Regions:
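Amide-forming acyltransferase catalytic core, primarily the GNAT-like/NAT-type
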Residues: 146, 160, 165-273
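Conserved beta-strand positions that form and line the central face of beta-propeller blades
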Residues: 94, 106, 153, 253, ...
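Core segments of cupin and vicinal oxygen chelate
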Residues: 2, 13-25, 57-102, 214-263
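Vicinal oxygen chelate
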Residues: 2-51, 65-72, 136-205, 252-253, ...
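The feature marks the first
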Residues: 36-37, 42-141, 148
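Short, well-ordered strand-loop elements centered on a beta-strand within folded domains, enriched
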Residues: 113-117, 267, 271-276
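Structured loop/turn residues at beta-strand edges in well-structured enzyme cores
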Residues: 57, 113, 157, 207, ...
Length: 276
């Protein structure tokens, strides 16, 4: 489901593109913002109104390459953060949380630090083939990865690697139950009686990969590429302006369009300014 809001936020830009006052702005409904700028109406994002897209079902995991000299430090950090080592070989480590995803972070061992891209799970083998053709890239079998599957890696217009996976088997059930939900008292309802809220110190409870962000140069180019080729649509768009008639889109929160199925507010964040 889609929640369309556009947020205006002004910034100082030192690149020479535009110069606006910092620390001012407002949040307005998308349809209000669209009256004065060249945005298409919300119906433009309905999956049925566009040509067939590569159908993404969820965000799967992140992929990075790390030098061997830094692997022990990385492992210590991720274990302290709340992940666990699912599998380790001479060339890679797979780190996971407690959810049904086999792993959420892939660390390949190489000569240098390198971003290998976020990974999206696609709906069908045909979608994987279409992604492969889009990037003219091969489909490889993940023989060593927990859960297996097949993957292809393409690159977006700014050169970021983008991975697509199909056929990976999830865990049959989470490794443990989620944390007990906090009971909150309000003015009229007092479900928590005679009990304190106490938190146990320790690592975070890592469930899944929720989202990742990219800091980019050409927002319009990247935005069109991701929304034209895949079922990614904006939940929120942020823009800056130096006068009422000149507005520049600078960031977007994108979610996966699954029709009437409710999904997370965003799984990808792209900005041409400071990355969150």
């Amino acid at each position: 489901m889609e929640n369309q809001n556009a947020t205006s936020s002004t910034h100082s830009d030192t690149s020479g593109g535009f110069n606006v006052a910092p620390n001012s702005g407002s949040t307005v409904p998308a349809r209000v913002a669209m009256k004065s700028i060249e945005h298409v109406p919300a119906t433009r994002w309905n999956s049925s109104s566009l040509t067939p897209k590569i159908k993404i079902t969820k965000i799967s995991h992140m992929r990075y390459q790390h030098p061997l000299s830094g692997i022990n430090g990385l492992t210590t950090f991720l274990l302290d953060f709340g992940m666990e080592v699912v599998k380790r070989t001479e060339t890679a480590i797979w780190f996971g949380g407690y959810g049904i995803d086999q792993y959420v972070y892939y660390a390949g061992i190489g000569s240098e630090k390198k971003f290998l891209g976020g990974t999206w799970e696609v709906e069908s083998w045909e979608d994987l083939e279409r992604a492969s053709k889009l990037g003219n890239s091969p489909i490889v079998e993940l023989k060593q990865a927990p859960g297996g599957g097949h993957m292809t890696t393409i690159h977006d217009p700014e050169g970021f690697p983008v991975n697509f996976i199909y056929g990976a088997s999830p865990r049959p059930q989470p490794k443990r139950q989620p944390l007990e939900a906090l009971q909150i008292n309000d003015e009229f309802s007092k479900p928590r009686k005679g009990a304190f809220q106490r938190f146990k110190p320790g690592p975070a409870a890592v469930h899944k990969l929720g989202h990742f962000g990219l800091t980019i140069h050409d927002f319009e180019l990247q935005f069109k590429w991701y929304t034209n080729h895949f079922n990614l649509v904006p939940s929120d768009i942020l823009y800056t302006q130096n006068n009422p008639k000149q507005k520049f889109d600078v960031a977007a929160f994108l979610h996966i369009d699954r029709g009437k199925e409710y999904v997370d507010h965003h799984c990808n964040y792209e900005t041409s300014l400071v990355h969150h």
